[in-house]
Amino acid sequence: MGQKIHPTGFRLAVSRNWASRWYANNTKFAGMLKEDIEVREFLKKKLKNASVGRVVIERPARNARITIYSSRPGVVIGKKGEDIELLKAELQRRMGVPVHVNIEEIRKPETDAQLIADSITQQLERRIMFRRAMKRAMQNAMRLGAQGIKIMSSGRLNGIEIARTEWYREGRVPLHTLRADIDYGFSEAETTYGIIGVKVWVYKGDHLGRNDAPVVEEPQEDRRRRPGRPEGRRREGEGRPAGNRRGGAGAGRRAAPGADAKSGE
């Protein structure tokens, strides 16, 4: 079901792409996958204040190429590129191969689902009301071009004893449509009452494939055929004056048998 499945995994090879782009045999696959998970966790902690949306890892020919998508690339690079060099050295030590790090800027962070989720969790950790944070994020996303957004928060909201889930939606979020460009993000806020999870879905429009074209509606015929009846035929009695129809308003009752005979006598 589109409501339950992960939106990115549901649309892989249709409108989304993998975050790890490499091939490995059965003996090396598990180790490389674990390495990717550890690298992403390290970058998430290291670049917590750099507004990192996603990390793409590629492994071409005994090398590694890591692309970091951030709305604040200056924080990642640092003064005169010092921070990026230290980050590259640490990644090479962890992965054991030469690493190339690329930084890509996110032009509209207000419509990036992961950055929206991170922003809401940071506000929750600063004791800001969750409804205010969610509605403000939705307004900013719709103002900057998103066609729909849905935000869900789960946990001990506002410190209540029983955990609950609340969500808000604005615009359209068609989760069942494969061609729909749905951006999904998830983040957790560590509060004094416990962990609050935040999920964000952002609908940015539809993707058109290589051979697809916009649908053009053809003008419908004014005269439509009724199902089950040929067009040239009509029912018995149609088109006649009301008084001449059988059983109509002008038709009299049938005479009783023998009435003509009595009248002729």
UniProtKB/Swiss-Prot annotation:
Origin superkingdom: Bacteria
Biological process according to GO: translation
GO cellular-component term (any): cytosolic small ribosomal subunit
Presence of the UniProt keyword Ribonucleoprotein in the record: yes
Keyword Transcription belongs to the record: no
Region ranges (Disordered): 211-265
Keywords assigned by UniProt, alphabetized: Ribonucleoprotein, Ribosomal protein, RNA-binding, rRNA-binding
Domain KH type-2: 39-107
GO MF annotation, one: structural constituent of ribosome
Assembly with partners or alone: Part of the 30S ribosomal subunit. Forms a tight complex with proteins S10 and S14.
Family of the protein in this entry: Belongs to the universal ribosomal protein uS3 family.
Role description: Binds the lower part of the 30S subunit head. Binds mRNA in the 70S ribosome, positioning it for translation.
Protein name in UniProt: Small ribosomal subunit protein uS3
Organism: Cupriavidus metallidurans (strain ATCC 43123 / DSM 2839 / NBRC 102507 / CH34) (Ralstonia metallidurans)
